[in-house]
Amino acid sequence: MLTNIAKKIFGSRNDRLLKQYRKSVARINALEEQMQALSDADLQAKTAEFKQRLADGQTLDGILPEAFAVCREASRRTLGMRHFDVQLIGGMVLHDGKIAEMRTGEGKTLVATLAVYLNALAGKGVHVVTVNDYLASRDAGIMEPLYNFLGLTVGVIISDMQPFDRQNAYAADITYGTNNEFGFDYLRDNMVTDQYDKVQRELNFAVVDEVDSILIDEARTPLIISGQADDNIQLYQIMNTVPPHLVRQETEEGEGDYWVDEKAHQVILSEAGHEHAEQILTQMGLLAENDSLYSAANIALMHHLMAALRAHSLFHKDQHYVIQDGEIVIVDEFTGRLMSGRRWSEGLHQAVEAKEGVEIKRENQTLASITFQNYFRLYTKLSGMTGTADTEAFEFQSIYNLETVIIPTNRPVQRKDFNDQIFRSAEEKFEAVVKDIEECHKRGQPVLVGTTSIENSELVSKLLTQAGLPHNVLNAKEHEREALIVAQAGKVGAITVATNMAGRGTDIVLGGNLKHQTDAIRADETLSDEEKQAQIAALEDGWQAEHDKVMEAGGLHIIGTERHESRRIDNQLRGRSGRQGDPGSSRFYLSFEDPLLRLFALDRAAAILNRLAPERGVAIEHNLLTRQIEGAQRKVEGRNFDMRKQVLEYDDVANEQRKVIYSQRNEILTSKDISDLMQEIRSDVVSDLVDTYMPPDSMEEQWDIPTLENRLAAEFRLHEDIQSWLKADNAIDGQDIKERLIERIENEYAAKTELVGKQAMADFERNVMLQVIDNQWREHLAAMDYLRQGIHLRSYAQKNPKQEYKREAFTMFQDLWNGIKFHIASLLTSVQIEQNPVAVVEEQPIGNIQSIHSESPDMEELLGQSQTDLVTEAFNPDGTDFSPEALEARGQIVHRNDPCPCGSGLKYKQCHGKLA
């Protein structure tokens, strides 16, 4: 109560921010006439002027009013769109690194141009992040004329682009792309073995469209680059036969083999279930008699069994996935879109493939991963925009340090939001939905019906067909027709059935989207120019009449067939109606069979229902019920927030390790001379090895000299008689032995370097180091994943799982780092160089030049392409200079992908171009 009184007296934080922004709006508006008076050339020259002022020390905030005024005027001239005052406020909110909540239809795409233009002037690049390739290409195409007019370049990142094209797109002043593409490019950049293969620049400023969808809904979905692991595919098929033999428990304490916790989306085997599963697996010959699923040797069996149980109990066709072209394609639970190319991890995808009888593809091993939470926190400045952020404002603030500012609408919202209607059964609910649609259709009012699953959208479609009502269905299966269906959803009497509308990205215009219709006519190659003009003219004449008719009928009517777990998704559905002051209405139809009511509000709601006891087909409308449902939604939102926060807390541990590894990789990639680093690694490894078998401050009797000598011979090809050193000099200690061994290793290494050349050896070292780091990091990620999966069991021993995870992860990372150094030192020290004469270069195939030999059995696998790095020396015995500078001086033009002129057969960038 005191908070409400304070808000009335002083205004809310949001009110105070808007008041400050309006002062800046007044300054921008005061410059409008001045900008309108400028010629195109003078207006365009402002960009160069701003860049110079920034170079002279002025800040972006200092030039903001002028830059916004220039962008607004340029937009008016190139796009025919002038920014409203509230859009100027939105632009300032984005520039300040905050989230702008703007209603559907308020022009978020245009708002972004203000902050994007201003921040692009700094020359460090700006990323505009969208939810799919279509929106990235569309928004970039619409706004490119504006940016080009102002002297800025625009790039677009879409899937399947080649690295060279990606480099060009990232080099542009402004880069559009999806959250997935930006994230995967970051991971790929940290896997390259040549710094020139990187595509991204520094992560400077990002504007995230539909920020709640990306930073909230997808926060728990990590980006993973993976490779195929060695896996027994037949085991998935065998395990798929086990779940039908196990009995599902009706309640958590009931009889049976396993309990399905729908709230937590988990399957828990009971004690009896473990015994039953062990009996079945023993009969199948997969488990030895009296053996346990919990023994270390049977971890893989337990992993496959739980994956099969989850596939059968929690993942359902046409709700969580569809089968398309013989493959399992995941359905996004928030947007209803197909997520082609994505696969569930931990063997779940293979278990679902086995359940559905489609081809089982091998389980993947993680090579690199990052969550969106940690990726977007890498940007120097981050901002976002959406129509629904206020309900998640606390999460944005606590996790991303992003404040949410609610931007007022340009025109007052005219939409009427009716109370929910609640029915006893789903059958009664859908009957009422069809009746409401029928009434709207009769008066010409367009209707958008929102469902939470493909299954429900197809059920509604079936009922509408039976009622003789024409309609369009928009769900994951109709992805190709999506834009066309949405564009016409506002026509007179149109009925559109859609899975969740989150992130659809296309406004529903009353009377139909005229631009989409005229574009379709212009693209029709069967029509002549005269026919096209005639059809467009007729369309434009008829559109206004249709628009007016829809307005009179009440605008777009939204029908929700059930409440989503998140109020935000419900608000997104409602927000499709009433854009820019248009009339509209919305109503949700619920039943006590809906998952939300069944799982979270059943007890009290059932008691209320029994008291009211309506007849069949009669709806209940009661404030207490509405509050009960909203309370259930808040409960789910709170639980989901806790889960996302927990994911972040665990991922933060891996994130710190990731930063160290990627920083070290980058240092190796970019350093011209890594000899000091190599020397330090060799010294550390030898010191650690000596300390292991000759512990400091220990007696000589405790030393294990024979094992030390064997390890030195096996790992470093260093055959030294340390026993004789000790006999010859009684005063010798561990430190003296370290110094002698390091001196021997350094002398041998210097001889090898002299043999092949310093630069060639440096490149060889760099490749080996990178490959060792990548291999060891990959194994570490798998170990961290296994640790994470089982760490919750520590709570049974009265230990804090998070603290235990941090402690063990730290120990594992120390072991990782020591292992990396040991493998690098061992491989590079044990390498032998063989000189093979090259009499006639043209007749000597590269494959016959054996530059490196190793007794280590996995040397070939670890080194891979590194063997060819020494070829450059063999093909250039007279030391001819093939550097870019020398070639240019001789008038030779050699591009990076051309064959090297030395005759090695390698590309220039992999040969002397790389050495340069």
Curated annotation (Swiss-Prot):
Zn(2+) binds at residues 900, 902, 911-912. It is an enzyme of class 7 (translocase). InterPro entries: Helicase_ATP-bd, Helicase_C-like, P-loop_NTPase, SEC_C_motif, SecA, SecA_CS, SecA_DEAD, SecA_motor_DEAD. GO terms for cellular component: cell envelope Sec protein transport complex; cytoplasm; plasma membrane. The keyword Acetylation does not apply. Its main location: membrane. It catalyses: ATP + H2O + cellular proteinSide 1 = ADP + phosphate + cellular proteinSide 2. Disulfide bonds: none annotated. This is Protein translocase subunit SecA. The gene is secA.
